[in-house]
Design a protein with these regions (language model features):
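Intrinsically disordered, low-complexity boundary segments flanking structured domains
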Residues: 131-134, 251-254, 516-517, 598, ...
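General structural signal for secondary-structure boundaries
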Residues: 1-3, 105, 136-137, 273-280, ...
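C-terminal domain-closing interface element
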Residues: 139-158, 281-302
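A generic short-segment signal for beta-strand/edge and adjacent turn/coil regions
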Residues: 82-86, 112-116, 177-181, 495-500, ...
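Extracytosolic and intramembrane catalytic regions of membrane-associated proteins
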Residues: 23-49, 53-61, 93-94, 174, ...
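Juxtamembrane/start-of-transmembrane alpha-helix segments at the extracytoplasmic/lumenal side
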Residues: 267-286, 346-355
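Alpha-helical transmembrane segments of integral membrane proteins
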Residues: 287-586
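Soluble extramembrane regions of membrane proteins in the secretory/endomembrane system
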Residues: 1-274, 637-642, 647-649, 653-689
Length: 736
């Protein structure tokens, strides 16, 4: 019920719907007989390109009986303008409301519990930043549990932790039902530019865990992130984690949470999550390598392999792994060439079937290659060749990327044990053959439970974009190499049959993928339409992004303009952004990926800027401007150009940090202000030189204006907005 009330309509920060949802959350928390703390403040980040917002965070605090600090449960209650945000992050808010109710109904916790609903996460984590930097409760936090979503289904993944996570990971693995997550995602996330509110909380230097479910990621930040599409099992899994972990950390000494990082991974078919200290990673890798050497020496003494044959096979297998990664890198592009029906980040429609085709193609190549190699090498040489790559990878990851070491270590152990069980010619006592075959199949468990689920996870998380395609290709090749002994068992002398069967399956997957006839309500096209008005020139344009973000600009664009867009753009739209959208430092109006056409001019309120003062300063002047939004716009932008700013204050708050060192002719400065006061904002800039200052003020509001005398067909279900959604943009320029 919480999700249905929260996610009826989009609620971006600063919107009327956002305020309605906020008031409803205050009432829901108040119904628990808890006093609600409201943090209303302004916050800003950046120097040359500043983001700012008026935010209103909501929080409650349950006092502990013998507190050693506070446990913080966090989720954000705003969402993007394009969709209602049932999963992102209505699910997190609902989780916290129910967890608070359950915990309050039970025995009192020893530690304090803070429940924080942040504002303006989608605009740059500004609500979380305001809490961390400005609220007095922040200094009490010792443990953070953050709940997010990047899809509408799937298990709640624990995808990020704080440093020194051994204790908190152990509690997660032992308490949460069907734990899902691994230290691999922790290592990957540390190297990505992605952020959630948890990124701000980590600045507190506290322990923490970050959760999100990611299934059906294509619904993320679109109208399809709706209550009807939200998997209740995902919501329940998130809620289970919140309650058990809040209770556990609420009873622990929060001063004793720091420890060495852990290597951890979940086994999805088993429902457990093994974990051990990173200190053990290198000794385990060395031990696995030693087991490999022992097995190889035994095989050599039995004349079951040779050094020369194994070296040649190592080269062949390493080339195969690299080729599989390259094929995966190009797979999304190749699929796009077949029908050019693109999704963001280089993904394509029917991506699941194309991913299955990719895996099948790599499997077919490996099985065919295996059959060819068996004409020259015996099974042991091929197995040890693949395992040698695992040895090198296990040692390297255990030293450089410790959290990823389990991906290669445990399949290596299983592969070595399988190779030791394999005997040339299968000359064994009667009755021993089936037992050995069973043992060999059992040793496939590490690869089956670790490597192959990662192939699926990568696709679910990132689709078939180039980077994820490459990862899928490499993981598939590694998974096949780890099972080379099992391949020998399955083939049983019929070496070409596995390749033939894999080829048939691959062809079937490709046939299903290419039958996609077009965008539909099940697989919609993602298009944002903007009405862009230049208040100075009294002109207006329609503009639409025609190639999704991350898609190669030289790829074909099937069916453009879309039939629905033709009523706005006509049959011969221009390429590029309208002038009113071009910032002083951005590319020219020929920017690819956009289509534009003239639009009827509608009388719309325009944002305003005025010069409050201009006084001499050493080497230049100090200018104070007043920028005022047009009305109830979502974002007020101020773009300044013409003189380099060396010091800036917004509403009396000096921007923290040094202005970046830039080229002398780089004079651009910008502010994007979410939920700006209707009375306006004051900007003071200390400038180098006294050259005229060009100032553009831009007001962005959700939705499109009514056009007198024109009626447009509504969006079909096969064409939907994403992220910022449809917008009305009004720009006015000044020279001061």
């Amino acid at each position: 019920a919480h999700v249905e009330r929260i996610a009826t309509r989009p609620r971006p920060a600063g919107s009327a719907q956002h305020d309605l949802v906020r008031d409803g959350l205050v009432a829901a928390l108040g119904a628990l007989s808890l006093p609600v703390e409201r943090q209303v403040t302004t916050v800003q980040q950046g120097t040359a390109a500043v983001r700012a917002a008026r935010v209103e965070n909501l929080m409650v605090r349950l006092k502990g009986t013998a507190s050693t600090g506070a446990v913080l449960l966090a989720a954000h209650y705003d969402c993007v303008p394009a969709g209602p945000g049932a999963a992102d992050d209505g699910s997190g808010v609902a989780t916290l409301l129910e967890a608070t109710r359950a915990i309050k109904a039970g025995p009192a916790l020893s530690n304090d519990l803070i429940v924080l609903l942040t504002d303006a996460e989608e605009f740059g984590l500004l609500g979380a930043q305001a809490f961390v930097e400005q609220h007095p409760w922040a200094k009490d936090v010792r443990m953070v549990l953050d709940f997010e979503a990047r899809g509408t289904s799937g298990p709640s993944q624990m995808f990020e932790t704080s440093a020194g996570n051994g204790v908190v990971v152990s509690e997660w693995a032992s308490l949460v039902p069907r734990p899902s997550g691994s230290s691999l995602t922790y290592e990957v996330y540390k190297r990505l530019p992605n952020d959630t509110d948890f990124s701000m909380f980590k600045k507190l230097g506290t322990a923490g865990l970050n959760f999100a479910f990611i299934g059906n990621w294509e619904r993320y930040h679109t109208p399809r992130d709706s209550p009807g599409n939200l998997d209740r099992g995902s919501l329940q899994h998130e809620g289970d984690a919140a309650v058990v972990l809040a209770r556990r950390f609420g009873a622990m000494d929060l001063g004793a949470l720091q420890s060495r990082d852990a290597v951890y991974f979940s086994l999805p078919l088993v429902g457990v999550a093994p974990r051990y200290s990173t200190v053990l990673a290198l000794p385990l890798a060395v031990g696995a390598a030693g087991l490999f050497v022992l097995a190889f020496v035994i095989a050599r003494r039995r004349r079951e392999t040779s050094i020369g044959g194994t070296v040649l096979a190592v080269i062949v297998y390493a080339v195969f792994v690299a080729a599989a990664g390259l094929l995966g890198w190009r797979s999304g592009r190749l699929a796009g060439l077949l029908h050019a029906r693109w999704l963001p980040e280089g993904n394509v429609l029917m991506g699941g079937w194309y991913a299955a085709t990719l895996v099948g193609a790599i499997a077919t190549l490996w099985l065919a290659l295996y059959a060819l190699l068996r004409k020259k090498f015996n099974a042991h040489s091929i197995a040890f060749a693949a395992l040698f790559v695992f040895v090198a990878g296990a040692l390297a990851t255990s030293w450089f990327v410790v959290g990823a070491s389990f991906v290669l270590q445990w399949p290596l152990v299983g592969g070595v044990l399988a190779a030791m069980a394999l005997r040339a010619g299968w000359e064994v006592p009667p009755g021993a053959g089936p037992l050995r075959a069973f043992i060999i199949c059992l040793t496939a468990a590490p690869a089956a439970l670790i490597v192959w689920p990662l192939v699926s996870l990568v696709f679910v998380a990132m689709g078939l974009a180039p980077e994820s395609g490459a990862a899928i290709g490499v993981l598939t090749a590694l998974g096949l190499g780890a099972l080379s002994v099992q391949t020998e068992v399955i083939a049983q002398g019929r070496r070409w049959w596995p390749a033939v069967i894999a080829a048939i399956g691959t062809a079937a997957c490709l046939a299903v993928a290419v039958t996609e006839t077009g965008y539909s309500s099940r697989d919609p096209r993602l298009v944002n339409l903007l009405y862009v008005a230049d208040a100075d020139a009294r002109t207006a344009q329609w503009t639409a992004q025609t190639i999704p973000r991350g898609v190669p600009q030289d790829r074909p664009r099937a069916g453009w303009p879309d039939p629905w867009l033709r009523q706005y753009l006509g049959d011969a739209p221009r390429t590029g952004r309208p002038d009113a959208l071009v910032q002083p430092w951005s590319a020219a109006t020929g920017t690819p990926g956009f289509l534009s056409a003239d639009a009827p001019v509608v009388e719309l309120p325009a944002p305003q800027a005025s010069l409050v003062s201009s006084t001499p300063a050493e080497g230049g002047r100090t200018v104070t401007l007043r920028a005022t939004p047009a009305g109830d716009g979502h974002v007020l932008s101020v773009w300044v150009n013409g003189a380099r700013a060396i010091d800036v204050s917004i509403d009396g708050k000096r921007i923290a940090g040094q202005m970046p060192a830039r080229a002398a002719n780089d004079t651009a400065w910008s502010l994007d202000y979410v939920n700006a006061p209707a009375s306006g904002t004051t900007i003071t800039l200390t400038l180098v030189g006294v050259t005229p200052l060009t100032v553009a003020v831009v007001d962005r509001s959700a939705g499109l204006p009514e056009i007198p005398g024109r009626t447009f067909a509504p969006r079909p279900a096969s064409v939907i907005p994403i992220q910022a959604g449809d917008q009305t943009v009004v720009r006015r320029s000044y020279v001061f």
